[in-house]
């Protein structure tokens, strides 16, 4: 089993449990150059809010889009957008990525901005 398939296996297991709970999910996807965050409805078929370093408004504020500062900016942006739509409680779906570095920075920034998970 290679690194990617192991991560996907971990992510699938976590998503199955979150689906049983019927929770709104804050999903994170990470690449070496960018980080993406989406708030997905409990049914799993609707993206309620999204933010990423690909967006011009966020990328202009940053020197580089693949570091912890960029992840924190995305976390803050997605939390503010979720609160505008009335979403306060979410479950954090790290997509099989280790809770460390950029993933942790995004989660901490989202918590500081008012999301609860």
Swiss-Prot record:
GO CC entries: cytoplasm; cytosol; cytosolic large ribosomal subunit
GO process terms (BP): cytoplasmic translation
Post-translational modification: The protein has been shown to contain a phosphoserine, which was required for the protein to bind to 5S rRNA. However, the presence of this phosphoserine is controversial, and it has not been seen by mass spectrometry.
Pfam families: Ribosomal_L18p
Chain residue ranges for the region called Required for binding of the 5S rRNA/L5/L18 complex to the 23S rRNA: 1-17
Note on domains (UniProt): The basic N-terminus is not necessary for binding to 5S rRNA. It is however required for cooperative binding of L5 and L18 to 5S rRNA as well as for binding of the 5S rRNA/L5/L18 complex to the 23S rRNA.
Oligomer and partners: Part of the 50S ribosomal subunit; part of the 5S rRNA/L5/L18/L25 subcomplex. Contacts the 5S and 23S rRNAs.
Stated name of the protein: Large ribosomal subunit protein uL18
Provenance organism: Escherichia coli (strain K12)
């Amino acid at each position: 089993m290679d690194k990617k398939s192991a991560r996907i296996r971990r992510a699938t297991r976590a998503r199955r449990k979150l689906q049983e709970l019927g929770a709104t999910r804050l999903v994170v996807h990470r690449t070496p150059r960018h980080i993406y965050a989406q708030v997905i409805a409990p049914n799993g078929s609707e993206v309620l809010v999204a933010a990423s370093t690909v967006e011009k408004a966020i990328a202009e504020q940053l020197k580089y889009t693949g570091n912890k500062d960029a992840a924190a900016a995305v976390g803050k942006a997605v939390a503010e957008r979720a609160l505008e739509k009335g979403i306060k409680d979410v479950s954090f779906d790290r997509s099989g990525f280790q809770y460390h570095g950029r993933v942790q920075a995004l989660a901490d920034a989202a918590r500081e901005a008012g999301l609860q998970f």
